[in-house]
Amino acid sequence: MRNLLRGMLVVICCMAGIAAADEKNILVTSGSDRATPIAVVPFGWQGGSVLPDDMAQIVSDDLRNSGYYAPIPKGNMISQPNQASEVVFRDWKAVGAQYLMVGNITPAGGRLQIQYTLFNVATEQQVLTGSVSGTAEQLRDMAHYISDQSFEKLTGIKGAFSTRLLYVTAERFSVDNTRYTLQRSDYDGARAVTLLQSREPILSPRFAPDGKRIAYVSFEQRRPRIFVQHIDTGRREQITNFEGLNGAPAWSPDGSRLAFVLSKDGNPDIYVMNMASRQISRVTSGPGINTEPFWGKDGSTIYFTSDRGGKPQVYKANVNGGGAERVTFIGNYNANPKLSADEKTLVMIHRQDGFTNFRVAAQDLQRGTVKILTDTNLDESATVAPNGTMVIYATRQQGRGVLMLVSINGRVRLPLPTAQGEVREPSWSPYLN
């Protein structure tokens, strides 16, 4: 979240006792063990027309993206069964698959019926069997559903493949003509739709816990203000209009409060608004910039970025009062804090001592170890899947802002397909079902 600290300073200009590091805090730069081989066979199709999406490929990609599974390439498959009775397990043992999924799609009264079965290849036993139905336009939804069910059955972790992603695009046509759009897509970048379009910048979009509303910063009328918008209807409401900076909105776990950053009293500080009464209270104070709030699950703790010690580091504070406690000690820059679902891991933008690269890193909050997750150089705005298995972040490739996905175990790193122009400010939805 290098860009947010930088962005605050830009906005302000345009609008014209730290503990020692524990010895157990160490930096880890390498990945972990290998992913589990799985084969997702192309699903059989009993209809005449060509389907708009390849369900097996979507399921395969989902499981790969989690970092837990390594799909067997189609070209390596000795056979391609569509149902359980056609499976020859020696074919799958020969290619090293530990799990196997087969499926079949049948037209039924204007809808599609999908049957699928997941096997343990070593034991030759069914792990999961199920069915789902919908229209051809819902193929991606059904594929993500199958991925969710399979992932949870195999790992015990709820799948996050049916979630959504918010992000901002900026397409420049001339020096004084840039179009900004707020987009919502599947978590993997597919099926993007425009929620808002503006000639002025849009920043920091965030899903509410109910998944039905979003908060964001808009520079309409040439000044930053925070809005809340209902996704289904497009109806929106201005939440803040204070002098100076209004930025970095963050919903409380129950959606009843909104944390954000204001500079109305001097330096940028974190405030919390009760969404029912619209009363605000101040959480941080003192010198320096305090920004990028992120709520803990208890609804009382806020993690945030502050340069109060000279360089940006992550702190936490209680919204009801009390001092701030420093959380990060490794590296000379740690910002944009996000917690995993179990609150055991802190994901952040990190810079090592002696280096100039900004990369996504994960800190084990119990042991203090920090692991570098990415190999890109100008990372920012990391956002974590609701089950904590994947991270999406903004970075630059070939001179263009893009979004990348990395698994929390560091095994998978890949770009997301997005629209033309600069792409930035990703934000992951909560579970939607």
Swiss-Prot record:
Signal peptide residue numbers: 1-21
GO cellular component, one term: periplasmic space
InterPro entries on file: 6-blade_b-propeller_TolB-like, PD40, Tol-Pal_TolB, TolB_N
Subcellular location: Periplasm
Gene3D superfamilies, sorted: TolB, C-terminal domain, TolB, N-terminal domain
Keyword Cell cycle: yes
GO biological process terms, semicolon-separated: cell division; protein import
Family per similarity comment: Belongs to the TolB family.
Subunit-level organization: The Tol-Pal system is composed of five core proteins: the inner membrane proteins TolA, TolQ and TolR, the periplasmic protein TolB and the outer membrane protein Pal. They form a network linking the inner and outer membranes and the peptidoglycan layer.
Entry protein name: Tol-Pal system protein TolB
Gene label: tolB
